């Protein structure tokens, strides 16, 4: 016998956080903004998680990499003990 499918939950759209804050230029020196797009392990979060467009994702990734190179952001996350 086939299992009955449960009805799907309605899709809940979340707005683009950069468009909502009216941010047009992503600066590598704005570490507070960039930290929102980096996981606690230091990985750059994906588009599905952050809800930003493909172009914005490329700009954020480039800004994070520049900030890491300039030692404004760490390459890895903070240690678990701190």
UniProtKB/Swiss-Prot annotation:
Q: Does the keyword rRNA-binding apply?
A: yes
Matches recorded under Gene3D superfamilies: Ribosomal protein S18
Which branch of life, at top level?
Answer: Bacteria
What's an example of a GO molecular-function annotation for this chain? small ribosomal subunit rRNA binding
Concerning InterPro entries, the annotation shows: Ribosomal_bS18 (IPR001648), Ribosomal_bS18_CS (IPR018275), Ribosomal_bS18_sf (IPR036870)
This protein's GO CC annotations: cytosolic small ribosomal subunit
A biological process term (GO) from this entry: translation
Q: Which UniProt keywords apply?
A: Ribonucleoprotein, Ribosomal protein, RNA-binding, rRNA-binding
Does the record carry rRNA processing as a key word? no
> What PANTHER family does the database record attribute to this sequence?
30S RIBOSOMAL PROTEIN S18 (PTHR13479), SMALL RIBOSOMAL SUBUNIT PROTEIN BS18M (PTHR13479:SF40)
Q: How does it assemble?
A: Part of the 30S ribosomal subunit. Forms a tight heterodimer with protein bS6.
Question: Could you tell me what this protein does?
Answer: Binds as a heterodimer with protein bS6 to the central domain of the 16S rRNA, where it helps stabilize the platform of the 30S subunit.
Tell me which family the UniProt entry assigns to this protein: Belongs to the bacterial ribosomal protein bS18 family.
Q: Which NCBIfam families match?
A: S18
According to UniProt, the name of this protein is Small ribosomal subunit protein bS18A
**Which source organism does the UniProt entry give?**
Streptomyces griseus subsp. griseus (strain JCM 4626 / CBS 651.72 / NBRC 13350 / KCC S-0626 / ISP 5235)
Task: Tell me what gene encodes this.
Answer: rpsR1
